[in-house]
Structure formats: C-alpha cells, structure tokens
C-alpha cells in the first residue's frame, strides 16, 4: 500500500484486517449496507416531522411536491459526489475532492466550511434528543440528557466503526418500523374516514399555490437531506472500492427522498388545518405533524413517534460525529490541522483523537444551546450554511477535474458540466435565501478560514497544487 501521508493519494488498497493499523490509514471494514445505515441515520428517516407544518404553509399545501423537487435538486449534488469519489476514494469527502479538482487552497476552504456543519449538525441532533427526553422525563434537565447522548454515542464511535454501524442498524430499523406503523395507520384512517384535503392537493397545492412558493419551501426542505454526503467521508473504510461508495450515496438520497415524499403526502391528507390556516398561525406549524396524528390516529402514535425521534436524533448525531472525525482526520493528515489528530487507534481502527476533538466541540455547542431558551433557534438558524457552501465547491471540483484539468480523459458534458453547473446554481440560490444570521456566521467562519490558509501558505503549504 502506498503512503497517503502528505499527498492524499494512495489509499487504494484494503486496510489491515488484524488488530494493528498502519499509521495514517483507516481499517476497511464497512460494506454497502453499513454506508447506507450511516447515511440514513444522519439524515433520519422521519426528518420532515419537525418542519412539515412550515413547509405546508410556505408551499400552499403542496408539501409532497416540495420534497419531490428537493430530491431532484439534491440529486445533482449526490451525482457530483459519485463522480469525485471514484477519482479520490479517500477520507475527507469534499475537502479531498476540492483539493483534487481546484487545488490546495480551495480544498482547505471546502473542508473548513464543511467542518462547520459537521460540528453543528450533530449538536442540533443532540439537542433534539435532549429536548425529547426531557419531555418524557422532565425531572432530568434537558442539558443533562443532551450531555448523556453525546457521551453514549461518542463511546460507540470510539469502540469502532463496525460496532457503531451494528448498533446504528438496530436504531435505524426501529425508526423504519415506526415510520411503517405511521404509514399503515394513515392508510387505514384514509380508507375508513377519507382525506381532510383533496387527494392531489399535496402534489398540486390549494388556492394559495404558486411555483415561487414551492421553490421557497424547497430552500428549507433541502436541510432534511444534509448528511447523505457523510457517506463519502468513509471512503477509506469501505470494502469493495469507490463504486460502492458512489452507489451508496445515490441510493441513500433516493431512498430518503422516497420516504420523505410518502410520509408528507399522507400527513398532508390527514392535516385538519389548511395551509392558509397554518400560515396564519406560526405557533401551530412546529406541531402540525403531531396534531394531524393526534386528530386522526391517536396520541399513542404521537408518543411512539416522539420516542423514535428522541433515540433517532442521538444516533443521527452519532453518524455526524463519525463523519466529522473523518474530516478532521483527513485535514490533519494533510497538516491542515494539528497532525496529532491524524493518529489512528491500532485496536479500534478509528481516528480516536479526531473523534474526541469533534465530540468536545459538539458537546460544548449542544450543552450551551440546551441551557438557553433560545438555544435551538440559534443553532438551527446557522446549521446549513457551511455544507451548502462546500457543496458549491464540490460542483466546481467536478468541472475543475474533468473539464479544466482533463485528468480522466475527455469530459462527458452532461455529467461534468451541465449537472454541476445546475447544481451549483440552485445551491447559490438557496444560500441567498438563507437567514441573515446564517450568512453572517458563514462569512465570519470563512474569514477565519482564509486567515488560517494565509498563515499556512506563508509556511509553504497553503497554495501548492494537489499531487
């Protein structure tokens, strides 16, 4: 196996199967199912539950159409991931791809922006878990539940990627079962009692429908998909080559999109309030999904979904924390972060210090937010900007590698120009529609990244071309 240290190239062979791991390399133990489990855990199969009411109000009742459009939009990004993982099958995901396609400087900025979200998305998920558990057991403060969730999932990640994947599979199976219970219950109620709205309304909208409203809602709905890209960060730990990673990225997105479309379509048919009524009552939007379940099926399903969300959120954070650890590991291996973080534990085969570093930052952010009444709003308002910026650089990397540098032969224009340009354009529009606080945080984080890059460049590493 050729060395990867310092160059980012050459992790092509399988890792050791014994108890030791070559320095700077991760152990290849993950299969296709494991990759899909990590992706779906990070996304969460019932991710639309919390924002269903907001999307229904914004889109004029066409919430299922919103998720159809959002799946197509994010499909462009998934396709670009699939292109780049084949030419750079290494840990680090978009950091590695931007280095390959655009150069060292752009690679660092892409990784730096992605790191913002890889640290904050798990913090939001941990906070969701703490809030849900506090609602079930109010005697224990939500910040304590939040800290417990961080501790348990961090221990699982340190145990090893294969062990964490096995536990994650059990949790994911539980979430899928709860979702199936909702689907079956909703179908029974609809057959027995009929729908609260027209059968096509979730696809065509009501009197307040407009395509502009749908696109505005899509800018919110794409947040449900953040996390599928984490699959690419495990590229050095998968058996069977980079094609398996590419297939897992695309499969995970299509499966998650299908689940989102089905559940929002059924929930919209059960929703007793019209989209106009929801738009006029913002306080009702957050609980709209649960209110529809209560009114049509019963509170027992409400409680079942709530427990599923509490456990599922913690394990969504587990997958996010694991991905954050791999990103930190990859950047440290290239000496963009302290090289100590690139060490791989010889027993578990995971980047232990990188995971611990990510866990500490996430713990501080999550507990800080859990102790504030407005903490959730602060985190949610800024959580997407880093990933969206990194996705734009991902699309640019495809053009840079296949078209500008022509490193893989003649480009295929629809794959290497049309799809990346359309995908980047849509993402730029979403960034423009982001909240002011998200844009400010993103710009500040970007400015710090440029300062770090300038310092590293002055030391001779910042602007060199990728090998």
Model-derived regions, located:
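Membrane-interface loop-to-helix entry segments
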Residues: 143-196, 249-254, 384-393, 415, ...
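A generic transmembrane alpha-helix motif of multi-pass inner-membrane proteins
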Residues: 386-387, 414-467
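Extracellular loop-to-transmembrane helix junctions
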Residues: 48-142, 255, 262, 390, ...
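Membrane-helix boundary/coupling elements in multi-pass transport proteins
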Residues: 90, 113-126, 225, 229-238, ...
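Membrane-interface "cap" regions at the ends of multi-pass membrane proteins
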Residues: 1-53, 57-62, 74-75, 79, ...
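Helix-loop-helix junctions that connect adjacent transmembrane segments
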Residues: 21, 63-64, 141, 170-306
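TM-loop-TM module centered on a large, flexible mid-protein loop between adjacent transmembrane helices
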Residues: 96, 103, 135, 248-320, ...
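Helix-loop-helix connectors at the membrane interface of multi-pass transporters/channels
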Residues: 95-99, 105, 126-145, 178, ...
């Amino acid at each position: 196996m050729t060395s990867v240290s310092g160059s980012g190239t050459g992790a092509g062979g399988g890792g050791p199967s014994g108890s030791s791991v070559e320095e700077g390399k991760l152990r290849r133990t993950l299969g296709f199912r494991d990759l899909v489990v990590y992706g779906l855990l990070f996304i969460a199969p019932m991710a639309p539950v919390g924002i269903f009411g907001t999307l229904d109000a914004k889109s004029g009742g066409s919430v299922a159409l919103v998720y159809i459009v959002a799946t197509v939009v994010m499909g462009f990004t998934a396709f670009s991931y699939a292109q780049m993982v084949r030419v750079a099958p290494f840990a680090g995901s978009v950091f590695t791809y931007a280095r390959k396609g655009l150069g060292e400087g752009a690679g660092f900025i892409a990784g730096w922006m992605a790191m913002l979200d890889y640290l904050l998305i798990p913090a939001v998920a941990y906070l969701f878990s703490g809030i849900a558990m506090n609602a079930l057991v109010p005697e224990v403060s939500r910040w304590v539940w939040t800290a417990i969730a961080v501790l348990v999932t961090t221990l699982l990640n340190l145990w090893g990627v294969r062990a964490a994947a096995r536990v994650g599979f059990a949790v994911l199976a539980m979430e899928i079962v709860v979702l199936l219970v909702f689907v079956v219950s909703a179908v029974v109620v609809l057959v027995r009692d009929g729908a609260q709205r027209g059968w096509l309304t979730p696809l065509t909208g009501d009197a307040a429908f407009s395509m502009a409203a749908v696109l505005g809602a899509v800018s919110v709905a794409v947040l449900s998909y953040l996390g599928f890209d984490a699959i690419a960060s495990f590229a050095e730990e998968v058996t069977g080559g980079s094609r398996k990673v590419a297939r897992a990225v695309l499969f995970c997105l299509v499966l998650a999109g299908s689940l989102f479309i089905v559940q929002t379509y059924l929930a919209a048919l059960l929703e007793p309030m019209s989209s106009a009524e929801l738009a006029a009552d913002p306080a009702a939007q957050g609980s709209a999904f649960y209110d529809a379940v209560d009114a049509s099926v019963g509170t027992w399903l409400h409680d079942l979904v709530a427990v599923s969300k509490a456990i599922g959120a913690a394990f969504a954070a587990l997958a996010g924390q694991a991905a954050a650890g791999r990103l930190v590991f990859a950047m440290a291996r290239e000496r963009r972060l302290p090289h100590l973080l690139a060490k791989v534990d010889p027993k578990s085969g995971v980047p232990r210090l990188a995971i611990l570093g990510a866990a500490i930052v996430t713990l501080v952010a999550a507990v800080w937010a859990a102790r504030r009444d407005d903490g959730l709003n602060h985190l949610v308002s800024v959580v997407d900007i880093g990933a969206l910026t990194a996705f734009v650089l991902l699309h640019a990397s495809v053009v840079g590698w296949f078209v500008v540098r022509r490193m893989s032969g003649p480009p295929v224009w629809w794959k290497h120009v049309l799809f990346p340009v359309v995908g980047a354009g849509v993402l730029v529009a979403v960034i423009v529609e982001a909240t002011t606080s998200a844009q400010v945080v993103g710009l500040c984080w970007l400015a710090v990244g440029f300062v770090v890059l300038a310092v590293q460049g002055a030391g001779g590493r910042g602007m060199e071309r990728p090998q």
